[in-house]
Amino acid sequence: MKKTISFLMIAAMAMIVSVSFTACSSDSDTSGNVEAYQEIVDNQVKAQKASSKKTKALLLVAFGSTWPEPFTDFDNTIEAYKSAFPDHDVYFSFSSAICRNRAAAGEHVEDLNAPKRNYYAPDIWLESLGRVEYAEITVQSLQVIPGEEYASVVACLKGFANNTKNDLRNEYLKNVKLRMGTPLMADPDEDVENLATELHKIYSQYANQGAMLFMGHGNPDDLDIFSANIRYTQLEIALQKKNKNYYVGTVDMMDNFKTDVLERMREAGYNSGKVFCAPLMSIAGDHANNDMAGDDDDWKFNEETGEYEDTSWKVFFSETEKVKNGYDCSDETMIVKGLLSYPAIRQLWINHTHTALNSEPLEWYHSNDGTE
């Protein structure tokens, strides 16, 4: 049943993406060196496939980051996937051009001693995998919900399947087995409950002391392509069945900003005490370090959204004068760790990959020359 649900879910998402997204492209890389990047990745893939002799490839796709801790989380995730899928060559990609460019430039080399890293776009990796003609290619999204970023990943794979660069053999594309692993909370029932269970194991020590807040990303209403913002609400409900002190808010979801979380806390009678915060994101990058745990205190109120957009969660929940919160919320109550840093949660993504591999291949191929 899980296999069937997953297959139907991806098929439905693909139909939506075909209307909302027409392409996934590396053209937004500001350096203009797309051809050079393609050559670099081509050489890496050729060398890997020649060495391993494997016929199956697995491409992990994260949004990306420029912070050192996420780099470590990504490295550990790659190694975990290599161990879990020894018959696959494992590759890794950033979907964000901004993150790719900034990581390559070494945005945090001086202030955080972060290394320069070269990551490449999913469409470049897929093109290279196709050029050496892997018999099976599985793409695993490392997103938390099936939102805007996941849509771009689906668009990448659809573009590859339909030979948008028009340089792969139609006979190959007709026969290659393509699969897609869904985000962490794709399914509203099993996925949400599985994540709630693992989060409770990790964070119950904090929920037992005070309010335990998770900051997700979310999508603005006009970009909530798969109506997946509701996963955050569903997760809060699942978590509160385990401990009433859990709350789940977001950066971008309307009616679920930190101001909305505060309102729910007050309605529940939690008006003082400790407030712990952790990112509900695959890694702890800019949002976790700045929007959640930073010192931004602009206090400019957006009347349309009802949010203090440039005030961090830490500052907001510790404020005593402007909004009279006065909770015990400080550097000591910030838990700046991404979900991929926890092996048990990383395993949930791996489970999604197993589900994809046990599902029927996606039937997305349509040749450019009119033949099937």
Where in the sequence are the language-model features?
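Active-site-proximal alpha-helix that buttresses catalytic centers in soluble enzyme cores
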Residues: 26-372
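Hydrophobic helical h-region of N-terminal Sec-dependent signal peptides
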Residues: 9-17
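A short hydrophobic/aromatic micro-motif that marks alpha-helical segments and, especially, helix-coil
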Residues: 17-18, 78
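C-terminal motif of bacterial Sec signal peptides marking the signal peptidase cleavage site
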Residues: 19-23
